[in-house]
Amino acid sequence: MAPAADMKWSKQALEQSYTMLNICPQRKNLNTGAWQMLEEKVREWAMRDSVLVVITGPILAKQMPTIGKTSKIAVPGQFFKVVFAPYARPSRAIAFVMPNADADKLCSEYAVSVDEVERLTGFDFFNTLPDAEQRRLESGVDADSWFQF
């Protein structure tokens, strides 16, 4: 779910951003609202912090509605984005969970801990970092350090 606007560094990368590996059904008002605002913020943060690790995806459930007549494509109820600034001093991370619905809040209001995204997805982010650093990065939600320059 890498935005095409972030893949302009090569023709191949841009083309690959439109493949099924990078696509997931999103409601229009999410994709043009809070989610789009978050993607724009991530671009700003990348300029500020030089390097970001961004992990984005759907939060899957056992039962999900589908779209399509011949090929049934599952429609997730939520999406997540985890952002890690490894070279910021101190390094920092933030996560977001947004419903696949009309998101009527500011993107900052969807901030959650990385631990919460791990609980919802079953993923273990930053597992190669020392345990103390992992706990520091994953346990809290410090939206102010991200949204205020």
Regions found by a protein language model. Give the residues of each.
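Domain-level detector of nuclease and nuclease-like folds
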Residues: 1-149
